[in-house]
């Protein structure tokens, strides 16, 4: 069973940690990472903008960031440790309002997106990889009980 830790550095938007943890567990199991370790951090815009600036040199907030532990020189030291997914709760709320989706469904979408990056998917590596990642995103969202069509706005913008 995956080991999942959830922390928050925001308090303005109520999140359901139990539901997030359950969704992460289901996603990891579906991807075959049954013994994985994952850290999820839920932040506000200010914290996310700081992380985005530090690690991506972009001076703005973003929806989700992933920090894989399985890359680089020491990536094979502890293969079950996947890394960290950082989700911006205010951004998720705004995205839901803009596209007529619930906050929780957008949180699930961003969680799927972040975990897929941790396990090697990268929509920025060309159209083929973007399409594979989009297909896997839709598959996992359906598994979580969402209508994949309701997220076309997000997936279409990833290539």
Swiss-Prot record:
GO terms for biological process: rRNA processing. It comes from Syntrophobacter fumaroxidans (strain DSM 10017 / MPOB). The keyword Zinc applies. Belongs to the endoribonuclease YbeY family. GO terms for cellular component: cytoplasm. SUPFAM superfamilies: Metalloproteases ('zincins'), catalytic domain (SSF55486). The keyword Cytoplasm applies. Pfam families: YbeY. The gene is ybeY. This is Endoribonuclease YbeY. Its EC number is 3.1.-.-. GO terms for molecular function: metalloendopeptidase activity; RNA endonuclease activity; zinc ion binding. Zn(2+) binds at residues 113, 117, 123.
């Amino acid at each position: 069973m995956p080991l999942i830790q959830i922390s928050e550095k925001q308090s303005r938007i109520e999140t359901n940690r139990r539901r997030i943890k359950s969704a992460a567990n289901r996603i990891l199991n579906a991807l075959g990472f049954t013994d994985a370790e994952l850290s999820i951090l839920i932040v506000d815009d200010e914290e996310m903008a700081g992380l985005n600036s530090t690690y991506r040199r972009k001076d703005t907030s973003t929806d989700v960031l992933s920090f894989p532990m399985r890359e680089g020189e020491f990536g094979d030291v502890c293969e079950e440790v996947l890394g960290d997914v950082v989700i911006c709760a205010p951004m998720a709320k705004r995205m839901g309002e803009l596209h007529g989706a619930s906050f929780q469904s957008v949180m699930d979408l961003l969680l799927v997106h972040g975990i897929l990056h941790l396990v090697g998917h990268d929509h920025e590596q060309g159209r083929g990889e973007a399409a594979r990642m989009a297909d896997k995103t839709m598959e996992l969202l359906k598994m979580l009980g969402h209508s994949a069509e309701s997220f076309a706005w997000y997936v279409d913008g990833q290539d």
